[in-house]
């Protein structure tokens, strides 16, 4: 018998059978796992299986090839704390949906687990006026890219190693480009936000945030969703922020 007990983040749940569900979770010590939850679709337990909830889980299976079963108990809900903040709710859904698609099964990554818990706490502390949490979300996406082998190099120019006059990011290499080098090709490059090390084009903090979202969306889509579709929650998040910040 194989089994583990651990803290988990609930990524998704799908009805299975009369009252059960298939739950997908990110475990702190064991990585992403799926398992069958008996009675998980009952009215009594439905609130436990909301995306982003922090829970304790007990997974068991006779063999490593089997799906296994999960017993899950709620520790702390996430979504109810931001129910009146639709953009933050989209961010929460985006995190869970992206992870549910791209994370390899049963490969531990405590760093991503901890980073996600911190991001959810940041979402709960945010409000409809302060959008500084979006920087945290962008850095979370950069961390995901890095942990899964697609790190962006934003600390120096890919051509001349300049560290002080960075202005762009190459979509081909994921590396920073200095202002002088990149200026003739600026229409083919991304603008590097100030909070990620850029020194130009940051007259508007809201534009800075949107430029960061454009960069991470592009590289996540290119590296993980080339043969699929970016989750609708991630697309919705970007559209909501574009609409909101363009009016501020």
Please give the residue ranges for each predicted region.
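Non-catalytic alpha-helical scaffolds and adjoining flexible linkers that form interface surfaces
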Residues: 1-21, 26-248
């Amino acid at each position: 018998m194989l089994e583990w007990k651990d803290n988990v983040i609930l990524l998704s749940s799908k009805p299975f059978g009369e009252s059960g569900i298939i739950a997908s979770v990110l475990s702190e010590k064991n990585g992403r796992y799926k398992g069958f939850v008996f009675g998980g679709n009952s009215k009594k337990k439905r609130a436990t299986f909301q995306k982003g909830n922090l829970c304790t889980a007990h997974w068991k299976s006779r063999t490593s090839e089997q799906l296994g079963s999960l017993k899950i108990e709620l520790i702390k809900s996430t979504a109810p704390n931001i129910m009146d903040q639709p953009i933050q709710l989209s961010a929460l859904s985006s995190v869970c949906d992206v992870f549910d698609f791209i994370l390899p099964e049963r490969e531990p990554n405590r760093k991503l687990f901890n980073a996600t818990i911190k991001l959810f706490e940041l979402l709960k502390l945010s409000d409809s006026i302060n959008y500084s949490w979006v920087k945290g979300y962008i850095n979370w996406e950069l961390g995901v890219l890095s942990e899964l082998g697609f790190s962006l190099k934003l600390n120096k120019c890919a051509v001349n190693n300049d560290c002080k006059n960075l202005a762009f990011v190459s979509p081909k290499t994921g590396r920073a480009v200095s202002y002088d080098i990149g200026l003739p090709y600026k229409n083919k490059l991304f603008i590097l936000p100030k909070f990620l090390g850029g020194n130009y084009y940051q007259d508007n903090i809201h534009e800075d945030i949107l430029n960061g979202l454009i960069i991470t969306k592009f590289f996540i889509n290119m590296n993980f969703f080339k043969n699929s579709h970016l989750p609708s929650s991630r697309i919705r998040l970007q559209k909501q922020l574009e609409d909101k910040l363009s009016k501020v």
